[in-house]
Amino acid sequence: MRSDAIKKGHLKAPNRSLLRACGLNDDDFNKPFIGVANSYIDIIPGHFFLNEYAKIIKDEIRKNGCIPFEFNTIGVDDGIAMGHDGMLYSLPSREIIANSIETVMNAHQLDALICIPNCDKITPGMLMGALRVNVPTIFVSGGPMRAGVNKHGEKISLSSVFEAVGAYEAKKINEDDLKDIECKACPSGGSCSGMFTANSMNTLCEAMGIALEGNGTILALSKEREELLRKAARRICEIALDERFKIRNIITKKSINNALVVDMAMGGSSNTILHMLAIAYEAGVNLDIKELNHISANVAHIAKIAPSLNTVYMEDIHKAGGVSAVIAEIAKKPGHILELDTLDISGKTLKERIENASIKDENIIRKINNAYSNIGGLAILFGNLAEQGCVIKTAGIMGERKFKGKAVCFNSQEEAIKGIIKGKVKEGDVCVIRYEGPKGGPGMQEMLSPTSLLTGMGLGAKVALITDGRFSGATRGLSIGHISPEAAEGGLIALLEDGDEIEIDVDNYSINANLAQDEIAKRKANFKMPNKQINSRWLKMYQKLVSNASKGGVLDLE
């Protein structure tokens, strides 16, 4: 056992003495030691109950002959951190989470790991840390929140609240309407109810085979979710000493491909691209951002979920057959690109896992011959504005897929929010928000407030928004993020001026500023990088080490 390094032989008497102080006895030193990486925190709706979930898991681990050791990571709620300086810390928190998993697991030489994530950067951060440790690992998340219901009986979610703020600013709704939506959008614990980043990543854990069936869709705080916790705890005890189930044997090039296929089929958050690039990096898998368009071109988009379709939520996907039903339907397409021989932590191949899966409601998960689109719900665009690529959630486009408009430039999200409220962005414009990339922010803020304001003001289908920052999974519209190289690296987005013509063609994967080469050269020669004051030592360190979005925003130590 890996844990013998802290519990076997006379030299380890001091180590055992400390372990005895934690309640262990002689028999316990012959059992596998299992790390239980929790992310309990009171301020996140998807996490405030995870302390109780950890108790269920630890109890089941003890019943099955192993010793659990719980520890915690930090967590940031992107929705609460939204629209102020707190969002600068969201993406950097992914690195702290990864580092904490690596630190605790390796410092104590634990044999296996069960992770309890749920929201935002916590799932990818835990995946990255677990890949560094490389022991048998299972992910079991807290589960999605059920959808809210407004006074008109319509299903709503957190994105409805952000958009309601825009509608209120545009005087389309009154204060009572706004309060009703605010109070009813998030009715219970869980990760926000649509196909936002949290649910996207928890779904992809299932697709990669690192989580049991139902992980992405079984509701939080349900009896079914509690049974999934017990099942995961029993399974980690069964595989704790089995090298076949080391996480790097599960998360491979093939399983990452499967995750991206599911991502495209379900129109996941654009943040998944950033995180999957980082996960591939930690797994030692070469994943080029250019590969993603090939995957998208070969995958039908068969499930639309809020915010792309505001009548469908994760609870509906679960009732309609869940992630397995989506995979099973995609596998029916001749020449599909799923890798069905991949092994998952249940001990089954993907082919075996989906054998009995089927769609139970074709209005929620469509058949391939009735797909929303014959291509996936995410795309990578290239051009002089994004030589290294940028990301768009095509599943969320509300208007035209070709767009030509004049740039309205802002040098921060805060500046953009003020400008949008004052009416500076009008129909036909391209709203440009720059210096918000991993280096420029630093921290790559999410642009949910600007996009939601535009949508709520009735401009969602009438303008485009481009940024070197990123978007919440709750964003919809012609919203293009992760522009690389970013403004802080001197990318062309930094040289744009108000009135420049920008052309976007989603179907041809292109994004360009219609500027002559001599004009670009002239602007480069006169360009001065804005001096952005950063007071945080952590953010300064992050800014010096982080790569741009085309590489996943990982810390580049080479």
Swiss-Prot record:
Enzyme class, spelled out: lyase
Chain positions found as N6-carboxylysine: 121
Record-linked Gene3D superfamilies: IlvD/EDD C-terminal domain-like
A GO molecular-function descriptor: magnesium ion binding
InterPro entries according to UniProt: Dihydro-acid_dehy_C, DihydroxyA_deHydtase, DiOHA_6PGluconate_deHydtase_CS, ILV_EDD_C, ILV_EDD_N, IlvD/EDD_N
Any GO CC annotation of this UniProt entry: cytosol
SUPFAM superfamilies the UniProt entry points to: IlvD/EDD N-terminal domain-like (SSF143975), LeuD/IlvD-like (SSF52016)
Entry cofactors: [2Fe-2S] cluster; Mg(2+)
Similarity-based family: Belongs to the IlvD/Edd family.
Protein name in the entry: Dihydroxy-acid dehydratase
Species of origin: Campylobacter lari (strain RM2100 / D67 / ATCC BAA-1060)
Species classification: Bacteria, Pseudomonadati, Campylobacterota, Epsilonproteobacteria, Campylobacterales
